[in-house]
């Protein structure tokens, strides 16, 4: 009987885990507000570069590959892209959390976002492919 109860409990736990998302999706509207911290150096609404490259359509892009920014990327960022770094959600999250740790030697002065919810929200904003 005790074995059956444990089995049923395990099944219920597995069902609940299967229903709940592994990681909460971010909120694009909240991400737009967080992205204000990035706007001094980056644009996400147009393909215009600023001090940093445009982040419009960054999700899925190979690191250091934006043609219009080639002469400004650090050697480290170009090497990261040549080594296969693609800006998927996981890599963007790691970079936003610790830019110098993810791509040592990159030029970005921003120290990173510490709040995981802010990171998820910025990624949701970038995935939404914001337009003016």
Where do the PLM segments sit?
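Sec/Tat signal peptide C-region and signal peptidase I cleavage site
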Residues: 19-25
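Short acidic/histidine-centered micro-motifs embedded in hydrophobic/aromatic stretches
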Residues: 54, 58, 125
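Bacterial N-terminal signal peptides that target proteins for export
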Residues: 1-10
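Bacterial N-terminal signal peptides
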Residues: 9-18
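Conserved Rossmann-like nucleotide-binding pocket used by diverse enzymes
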Residues: 20, 34, 109
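C-terminal capping alpha-helices of c-type cytochrome domains
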Residues: 86-132
